[in-house]
């Protein structure tokens, strides 16, 4: 399925079912070449504005295993920063090294957002339940404007 097909389907669903959310898991799965990604991002940005829906796109990041990801690790970072209202990374520290770590912990890193400075949320999920909780809502150094 390509971006044009998804956009057309979304327009139909907005009219018939009141579509509110569009999620595409993996931008590379809908673009033929990495050079096409900025056009696709612009297309989904326009779709979000035209239909007044939230659009969530996931993409790959490149980084060394010993560092936390950043905006510079996005394959098409300039285009993603241009068209995205918010950019978040899910970082799982146990993948840093072979020494292990807690597989139930993850950090949600907000690297671009229209209202707040970058910050990190720590999340812990229980292996016995499907519940997860944010262990610290905001770091003390997070600032709102």
Feature map (PLM): residue ranges:
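C-terminal regions of RecA-like/P-loop NTPase motor modules
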Residues: 3-26, 46-51, 64-145
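Conserved ATPase-coupling elements of RecA-like P-loop NTPase cores
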Residues: 30-37
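C-terminal extracellular loops and terminal segments
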Residues: 38-42
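Conserved H-loop
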Residues: 53, 57-60
């Amino acid at each position: 399925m390509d971006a044009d097909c998804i956009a057309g389907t979304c327009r139909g669903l907005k009219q018939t079912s009141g579509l509110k959310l569009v999620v595409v898991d993996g931008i590379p799965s809908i673009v033929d070449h990495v050079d096409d990604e900025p056009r696709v991002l612009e297309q989904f940005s326009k779709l979000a504005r035209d239909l007044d829906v939230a659009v969530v796109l996931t993409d790959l990041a490149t980084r060394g295993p010993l560092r936390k990801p950043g905006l510079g690790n996005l394959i098409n970072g300039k285009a993603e920063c241009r068209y995205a209202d918010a950019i978040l990374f899910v970082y799982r520290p146990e993948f840093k090294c072979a020494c292990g770590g807690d597989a139930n912990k993850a950090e949600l890193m907000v690297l671009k957002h229209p209202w707040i400075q970058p910050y990190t949320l720590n999340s812990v999920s229980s292996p016995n339940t499907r519940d997860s909780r944010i262990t610290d809502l905001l770091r003390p150094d997070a600032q709102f404007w």
